[in-house]
């Protein structure tokens, strides 16, 4: 992202109330784009739309030098349902991207997990990214703020064009990232952004789910 407020402003959208259900289907996009998803724009508008694929529906994101995301509020204790799973696919990664610099903080696909705090500077996020060059499995503080931890779930263009299913233990990842147990989960976000590099990127997301 271009400026530090981009990551932090996404954190501001976290919140909500309600008891944790037995299973939380964040979205499978079979009924289109749920209005619970809220657009958060930073520089231009990444185009998000639900498209048909393989007999079902998925969320497609297209960025052309833009940065905007979709944010959905969720209020639950991640220790009750720590597993986040999803499917995603990218057309390619961003050759000019560099996860270690502000100028290169662009990603073909990423999923934010937002843990809000009443004192905003203590709000933290896990950013599950399809990295451009960062080795798979790397944990790296975001170039703008150490309160956003980048986690390279996939890396590079080798598997571009293929649907991959991911499953992450948010509690374990939070402990590794920040050295303590997580607070309540406040929101989930998806973002495809290329505002720093001016590149083009297309990604697809589907079957976002929280389980035990």
Language-model segment annotations:
Residues 104-148:
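Extracellular/luminal beta-rich ligand-recognition
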Residues 73-84, 157-160:
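Extracellular/lumenal carbohydrate-interaction signature centered on repeated Trp-anchored short motifs
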Residues 87-93, 116, 171:
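Solvent-exposed strand-to-loop "edge" motifs in beta-rich extracellular domains
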Residues 8-17:
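Bacterial N-terminal signal peptides
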Residues 21-41:
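Extracellular carbohydrate-recognition regions
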Residues 49-69:
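Short carbohydrate-recognition loop motifs
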Residues 106-111, 146-156, 160-200:
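Extracellular beta-strand ligand-recognition surfaces/modules
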């Amino acid at each position: 992202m271009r400026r530090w407020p981009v990551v932090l402003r996404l954190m501001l959208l976290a919140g909500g109330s309600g008891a944790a259900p037995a299973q939380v289907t964040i979205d499978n996009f079979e009924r289109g784009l749920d209005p619970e998803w809220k657009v958060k724009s930073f520089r231009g508008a990444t185009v998000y739309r639900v498209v048909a694929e393989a007999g079902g529906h998925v969320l497609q994101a297209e960025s052309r030098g833009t940065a905007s995301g979709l944010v959905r509020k969720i209020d639950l204790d991640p220790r009750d349902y720590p597993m986040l799973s999803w499917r995603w696919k990218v057309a390619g990664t961003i050759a000019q991207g560099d996860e270690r610099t502000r100028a290169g903080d662009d990603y073909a696909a990423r999923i934010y997990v937002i843990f809000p705090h009443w004192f905003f500077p203590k709000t933290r996020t896990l950013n599950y990214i399809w990295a451009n060059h960062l080795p798979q499995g790397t944990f790296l503080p975001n170039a703008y703020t150490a309160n956003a931890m980048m986690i390279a779930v996939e890396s590079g263009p080798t598997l571009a064009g293929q649907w991959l299913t991911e499953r992450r233990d948010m509690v374990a990842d939070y402990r590794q990232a920040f050295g303590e147990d997580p607070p309540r989960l406040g929101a989930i976000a998806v973002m495809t952004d290329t505002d720093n590099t001016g590149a083009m990127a297309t990604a697809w997301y589907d079957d976002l789910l929280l389980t035990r």
